[in-house]
Amino acid sequence: MESERLERATRKWWFYLILVALLFLAPSYSSATGFITGEKNGEVVAEVLTYSLKPYKPFMPLLHIIVILFIAAVLVYGNRFGKIFTAFVGVNYLFIAFLQNTAVTERYGLGIITVNIIWFSLIGLLWLRDVKIRKTNYTFSRQPVWRYWVVPFAVLTFWSPDKPWDFNPIYLLTSDSPLAFCLITPTYLSIFYLLYLKVNLPALRVTSFIGTLLGISNIGIGFMRGVARAYT
């Protein structure tokens, strides 16, 4: 019954309107200034994202290897490893929620991106819930060639070259992707996309929506910064 309610809710427009509304209802926090709204909010977000993952840089090679091994295991063993993989994805998102979105900086003290913590925690909990209800079937069947268009993008975001056209293989072990939502999400979504209709649809919908929302936002911010530099 609960699963049916969630399934119906994630098909309604108002559910996603609530997720978007959290942008305004859950402002970022700084220990130096309190809760922040308006233009300052963007500054705090940028500052936190700049510094949040730096303490974990030494662990990135190990984290990359762990992610690769988990993906390889679910591709090889399917449902025999599916429950463990789903739990791993859920826990990964919970770690991302708090590690990527909190940082201590000289300018703002403790900075917290509140809305991201709420969004990413929701995603993590939805996938952890799937460990119990088992809505995802990791039986990988042969797909039409065109459906594999997601794979190159998944590899690219996991690789995450540090600079344009700098495809140094070392980034496959040193990038921030295991703890960065916008980098690891395309990797996970590519797997679930190939399982479409055999996957937990509420979890997939929410993950895809928030990922798309942040992706469009990041592209827009990057474009505006490029325009600003061109005219200064």
Each language-model region and where it sits:
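Juxtamembrane membrane-water interface segments of multi-pass membrane proteins
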Residues: 1-9, 70-80, 131-144, 165-171, ...
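N-terminal topogenic module of multi-pass integral membrane proteins
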Residues: 1-109
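Alpha-helical transmembrane segments of multi-pass integral membrane proteins
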Residues: 14-28, 87-99, 115-133, 142-166, ...
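Juxtamembrane "helix-exit" motif on the non-cytosolic side of transmembrane helices
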Residues: 32, 98-108, 159-171, 217-229
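Short aromatic-rich membrane-water interface segments that cap or initiate transmembrane helices
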Residues: 44-59, 169-187
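Short, aromatic-rich membrane-interface segments at the entry and exit
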Residues: 60, 81-86, 109-112, 202-208, ...
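Non-cytosolic membrane-interface motifs at loop->transmembrane helix junctions
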Residues: 106-118, 140-142, 170-179, 228-232
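C-terminal transmembrane helix-loop-helix hairpin of multi-pass membrane proteins
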Residues: 173-232
